[in-house]
Amino acid sequence: MYINNKIYHMSLLACMLSVLLISIFLPYTQNSAPRPQKADSVYSFISPQEEEQTTILIDAGHGGYDGGSTSWDERVNEKDVTLQIALKTGALLEDLGYRIVYSRTDDNVSWPQDNAADLQARVDLGVEEEADYFISFHLNATDFYNDGARGFETYVTPGNDTAKIASAIHEQLAQLDYSIDRGINEADYSSLHVLALNPVPAMLLELGFITDDADLAKLCDESFQEEMASAIAAGIQETVEQ
């Protein structure tokens, strides 16, 4: 009986010592255990805006019922040349990572045969597509053929960075040495609908004079159109993030 009682007390004492040791060392083992790391994504969060592509609306001037200006022999319509250069430029910009929306990709247009409604439909498309920029392609003209008027120029909307973009485009076009740089101008709101009534930052490129033989020869040359498109795309890439 004495032996059993002694064993009992020894067992009880051992149990109490075990509890005491656990209570002493457990906090240290908890503190020394590796803590779970926060996910990296908490620190490398990218906002939806940063993930979105920059959207550019490429507008080939005229089209369908509206041929635009014509060459002296009436064989070349402005609408055809602007479409060719606009499509080439858009394709290059898409390759660079921009989201491109076209006002037209052929000579079939969906808007009515009314100039004001036509231009407003192009503006509305830019708004609907949430475009960041609107770039309209055109050719210039005068009332008389080969009267000395030639060169490229751009009209921009004030109060945004379109002038900066246009300047970069002009620098690239000037390197082609195909005509005269006529400069960058703020839009005349009485006549340029796609700039005056456009909430999207917009510019209108006049790439040369269809009424000048030297300009026209370059504008109609397909290989030179590729060079021109590359120059325009390079100017945009230099100043507009994808």
Q: Where on the chain are the PLM-derived regions?
A:
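Catalytic-site microenvironment of enzymes
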Residues: M1-Q242
